[in-house]
Amino acid sequence: MKKTRSTTLRRAWPSSDFSDRASDRMRSRSEKDYRLHKRFPAAFAPQASRGYMTSGDVSPISMSPISQSQFIPLGEILCLAISAMNSARKPVTQEALMEHLTTCFPGVPTPSQEILRHTLNTLVRERKIYPTPDGYFIVTPQTYFITPSLIRTNSKWYHLDERIPDRSQCTSPQPGTITPSASGCVRERTLPRNHCDSCHCCREDVHSTHAPTLQRKSAKDCKDPYCPPSLCQVPPTEKSKSTVNFSYKTETLSKPKDSEKQSKKFGLKLFRLSFKKDKTKQLANFSAQFPPEEWPLRDEDTPATIPREVEMEIIRRINPDLTVENVMRHTALMKKLEEEKAQRSKAGSSAHHSGRSKKSRTHRKSHGKSRSHSKTRVSKGDPSDGSHLDIPAEREYDFCDPLTRVPREGCFIIEHKGDNFIMHSNTNVLESHFPMTPEWDVSGELAKRRTEMPFPEPSRGSSHSKVHRSHSHTQDRRSRNERSNKAKERSRSMDNSKGPLGASSLGTPEDLAEGCSQDDQTPSQSYIDDSTLRPAQTVSLQRAHISSTSYKEVCIPEIVSGSKEPSSACSLLEPGKPPESLPSYGELNSCPTKTATDDYFQCNTSSETVLTAPSPLGKNKEDHDTLTLAEGVKKLSPSDRQVPHSSREPVGHKEESPKGPGGGPAASGGVAEGIANGRLVQHHGAEPSSLDKRKEIFSKDTLFKPLHSTLSVNSYHKSSLSLLKSHPKTPADTLPGRCEKLEPSLGTSAAQAMPASQRQQESGGNQEASFDYYNVSDDDDSEEGANKNTEEEKNREDVGTMQWLLEREKERDLQRKFEKNLTLLAPKETDSSSNQRATHSARLDSMDSSSITVDSGFNSPRTRESLASNTSSIVESNRRQNPALSPAHGGAGPAFNFRASAEPPTNEAEKLQKPSNCLQASVTSV
């Protein structure tokens, strides 16, 4: 197009070339006309200038050319002169320049000193030359590349290399020569000498600090010790700005050092402004990399990572009890637990795995997503991962005393001696784990998870905990009811494990609860932990079944002494018998267990004092009672026990009841009514609420767990249940008879159990007032606690408050009798400690599943953390206040010094177990 246009133009303007026209336009009209006339004859001029109106133009002006040589600006001459002098290694000063100009340009007038100075300053501003103490130097293409980065000191940019002016003379760039950076030039030195002086001094200072060449001082490289840390920081901030702007700050070098302070302050301000968003550390030294690696710029690379120190501090704030020592203890404990778990699994895992896997599957089905997804929680109630022997590792809280986290399964061994089931505390296990009281599983937990859940369930193992964590929130959100049920199951399992003896952990409360809820679900789900009271689980199932058939009846799982044939429950109780020998949950389920289980749970809830104690504790305790009380239960006339149990015995409950472990079913019939009178308003309709009942049981079990010997609680519960139950169905005399029969065997267990039951009753009475923070953590748990209270109230209303009070008194009397008769073989201290541990673990489990897992309201992570911390603090304070609660105490006193020792825990229990007074009672018993 340009060519066409040009040709067109030429056609349009034949009188002139396109190039001529371009220049002509820049000339005056007169000149243009003059040239036109000059080139073309006058005749053609008008035609030639079609585009111009010549009529009004000025007539051509005669111009005389002036002869003169080519003009060269003084600046260029000075540059040439400076370059030549630099090449000649001559110092370039103003005087030397004048001489050089005079010599080299003889015909040219020499500029005055003022003009020369001004021109030099202009050249410096234009960055054509730069002043140095040794004179001016021409700026060459290599100057800015070779010169070291500027150092800004005292708001002045100094060239480190200028310190050595000879080297910095790059006018004729010498190889290896470091020319002062252009900044020198930028800073126009009106008086180069003054500038040199000021600069030189500064440079000397800088130079003294370090070698000029080695220290490549870029704005960000302000590693110069000469630069104070603030300066060091400032240059980085201003590095970009300064590098850009320094060329314009020609005057800065001339500024005296007086401005250094101001410049530093200014630089700091700029630095702060520029790095407001970043965490700025003032570093004395910089590496070549500007934001030094030391700077905690976590936002960019790994925004999620929290420094270990910060993380630990957060953890400490959340859980003050969490210390390195505790963590170490916990780690060691976890290792031991895993080893024991492996050994135990070798011993009895094959049988237990089959039954437990079935049970766990059923339990998962019943619980749905949350439980099935969080295997760790499943393992609590029904170890899905394997036998309950494995559960201690999976769920230490359930099976371990809260203090020691020792798997209670391992803690207690039940012996079948004659007609009595004797529970021995596995001192080795306890001792090995007793010192370990970590409340926190740091074994494999992520720090983040640790922060979220300061009290993870250590027994589950890191993998389980991780699974639980990953699924727990989602699943908890999905099914809070399930989760709360499971949480209560956990607390129950912990309570049960505590309740029976702490060894009663044999039947994880969940297992027991599962037994109850799973009575409907799966048969042959009874589990026996080799060293634990897994048979107690069957007993629990029996009791659950008993309560299911007629929670009133079930509440007093009396063992029919007549039928001593080890029923499934008996088999469960029998240490030697494999889980297969235990009555399958199906058998138990075949009993009116659904209803009984619901009733059982409801009994626990409604008659938290008596029934609840028997139910939660009753499961395990009855297991224990069945174990320790097996004798007494067996002593009970089979007819007495069977009569009450007949309703739930139908499905092999009688078999269980004939045996000590099966004693739970013993007076269930009569007692069930009694319980119904007081609090055991049957919740038969609550089969779906079996989980809720289980939750209730958990809460109550938690209350009962603390009862030092859940066995005694079970015995006491059995007796007390008998008493209570006697009101509705069986005559109180019959129940007391049973209770008395049980008392000899249950004496020990019941002795402890009675205080527990009393506390359970008391807590049952106070249940509404008390609230289990752990169970409450789940809204469902709190609701369940309220429901339990309501159920208890309903039951009480059904029976009448007076009747309930009478029942409570009877229970207390039975408890006292049991306390007198209490001859629990397992050290009471161990039981107490086990129960305490179980209670604590139950709380932690309940908290873990309920309060910690849930993300809203009470279940918010922060709330859960605070609850966990509060619980831990409460537990610890209670332990300190109540030596009986301390692991060292180990329940030295009767487990049922709970009243005395359990009262501090009662506060704790109240907090932990406010939803259910039963929980409170168990904590109190702890």
UniProtKB/Swiss-Prot annotation:
Source taxon at top rank: Eukaryota
GO cellular component, one term: nucleus
One GO term of the biological process aspect: regulation of transcription by RNA polymerase II
Record field: compositional bias (Polar residues): 518-529, 746-769, 847-884, 914-926
Compositional bias per record (Basic residues), positions renumbered to this chain: 353-378, 463-472
GO molecular function ontology, one term from the record: RNA polymerase II transcription regulatory region sequence-specific DNA binding
One Pfam entry name: Stork_head
Region (Disordered): 1-32, 338-391, 452-529, 564-588, 632-672, 724-803, 825-926
Skewed-composition ranges (Basic and acidic residues): 18-32, 379-391, 473-495, 632-658, 785-799
Name of protein: Storkhead-box protein 2
Organism: Homo sapiens
Taxon lineage: Eukaryota, Metazoa, Chordata, Craniata, Vertebrata
